[in-house]
Amino acid sequence: MAKFKIKDGVAIIPEKTTEIGTEAFKNSRTLVEATIPSAVTTIEASAFEGCKKLKSITIVGAVTKIGANAFAGCEMLESIVMPDSITEIEENAFNGCCKLTSITLPASLTKIGAAAFADCNKIEEVTIPASVTEIGAKAFAITGWNSRLTKVVLPDGLTTIGDEAFDSCRNLAEIAIPATVTSIGESAFSGCSSLTSVTIPNSVTSIGFYAFYYCTSLTSVTIP
């Protein structure tokens, strides 16, 4: 596995690098900024996990996968630029990035893994790209009641909303469930206490236990 250097808080990654390996920068105490060069195709598991001073990541070019826990616990991460080459964001990839205020998910993305953006409590809006068919369990779930998420746009083509996908997003006021969704997982919208109305499309064949539990403002539910 390649070893990388950090100079003045910036990751030094050679242009010919093709992979940021498992735990490459894990728990670095000095890393503040990183640019992933265009030859890199994969950011492996825990590559930047626990880099508590990391503020900015720019991913250039050909990366297709962001591995499990890749940026988990990067508490100071404020921004990330992702290219349209990314198809998969694996579980816990950005879990606990509590300073991340906005994300632009690439149009190439097909899967958002379990807890990928869990406890990213400062994100206010999310638009899920049309290519995504599955939102993993706890993908945007919040521990506690401090979520700022107010708007989520779900695409036509989405089939699965995982267990606890938006659990405790207390400021989420509305959600439009596309007519392609077949499964709404257990506690998928539990604790979304600002949600006022929900329309379940004809395509849905399964609604899990507690899917809308503690949605205390919910006054209208339309079920086919």
Where are the language model's segments positioned?
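Structural signature of tandem-repeat unit edges
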Residues: 2-19, 29-42, 52-65, 75-88, ...
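Short regulatory "switch" loops immediately downstream of catalytic or recognition motifs
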Residues: 140-144
